Amino acid sequence: MWARLSPEIRQYLLITSNYWAFTLTDGALRMLVVLHFHQLGYSPLQVAMLFLFYEVFGVITNLVGGWLGARIGLNKTMNIGLAMQVAALAMLLVPASMLTVVWVMAAQALSGIAKDLNKMSAKSSIKLLVPEGADAALYRWVAALTGSKNALKGVGFFMGGVLLTWIGFRNAVLAMAVALAVIWVMSLLLLKRDLGKIMSPN
């Protein structure tokens, strides 16, 4: 069935799968961090501080992400985003004694960069895959991708709470890191190379 699909549809499905998997784990991670560190006795201000770098570095990445995608290719920015999210999750697998506010803030900074790289790459890639002049199709494809964001975030929040209850913080983070690493490897193998890259003139 996969082989019968057009290359554009295959790329669209791959990009959408990347985006959905990332959004789910991103939402779950945020809920895990809030609940876990609240359980450890962190004050509301300390918990809020954990996400400061997430937002700041996300804004910075949003400003330079388009330029970076044009320079190195959207496939690379998407794969870098996935890899950085795996790294951010791995940072939270250290012993509990090392999970200081500063350490978790650094992990969240990586996650914030990863989020905006992934989001920018997904949206821009979809626009390139739709044939020129097919504005209605472009609207539907982008709407299907981005319209699912809030719903997936909500599912991710719920998933984070459930995972924390069922298997605990460390195992939940490990499970998400492994799942996202599998998605990352598939993306490395299957995502079109030089997607969105501005080619240098000879």
Question: For the regions a protein language model found, what residue spans apply to each?
Answer:
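Helix-loop boundary and gating motifs at the non-cytosolic
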Residues: 2-56
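Cytoplasmic helix-loop-helix junction between adjacent transmembrane helices
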Residues: 107-149
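Flexible cytoplasmic inter-helical loops of multi-pass small-molecule transporters
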Residues: 188-202
